[in-house]
């Protein structure tokens, strides 16, 4: 079973913690990771883009000038794509980009992402701030030399969230909001011991 250090928020190691091998010690499945990340990014897209084709633009029903004898190029409509205020060629239309991923693949991707972050994981014995204080959050991050950090708490913690939300490259979320993209996108994964237990309950 993987074993990592257990730290307090001052950066001092206070013990070790055994991680569940079914969650933090699996073989990393790159295919599942790719599929889930692509789906997650696709599902973020609004798909509300829209433009008018030449048939949808108002006007342009009459031929602007006769076909021959003017010396100018022949034209059939002032709403053709080459005209100013003309329609758009292959105009984008609203569409649904959503992708569905099987539950089993989502689980494989999540355990693969967690396993890939064990080497960059900092498990905290506890994480609380008496009041929202960015200085305290910066002090904690500096103690671990953390860069581009994802902080995972067991529950929604307003003081922790407000303390870290203004720090560039730091994301805070409760354990029930974790996702594959954010796990892979961080360089340091900072997680509380209670959050680790909750993850193991769900994915073991």
Curated annotation (Swiss-Prot):
Gene3D superfamilies found in the cross-reference section: 3.40.1370.10
Matches recorded under Pfam families: Ribosomal_L4
Keyword Nucleotidyltransferase listed: no
InterPro entries named among the record's database cross-references: Ribosomal_uL4, Ribosomal_uL4-like, Ribosomal_uL4_dom_sf
Keyword tRNA-binding appears in the UniProt entry: no
Domain of life: Bacteria
SUPFAM superfamilies: Ribosomal protein L4
Protein's GO biological process: translation
PANTHER family: 50S RIBOSOMAL PROTEIN L4, LARGE RIBOSOMAL SUBUNIT PROTEIN UL4M
Function: One of the primary rRNA binding proteins, this protein initially binds near the 5'-end of the 23S rRNA. It is important during the early stages of 50S assembly. It makes multiple contacts with different domains of the 23S rRNA in the assembled 50S subunit and ribosome.
Summary of subunit composition and partner proteins: Part of the 50S ribosomal subunit.
Protein name per Swiss-Prot or TrEMBL: Large ribosomal subunit protein uL4
Native source organism of the sequence: Clostridium perfringens (strain ATCC 13124 / DSM 756 / JCM 1290 / NCIMB 6125 / NCTC 8237 / Type A)
Lineage: Bacteria, Bacillati, Bacillota, Clostridia, Eubacteriales
Underlying gene: rplD
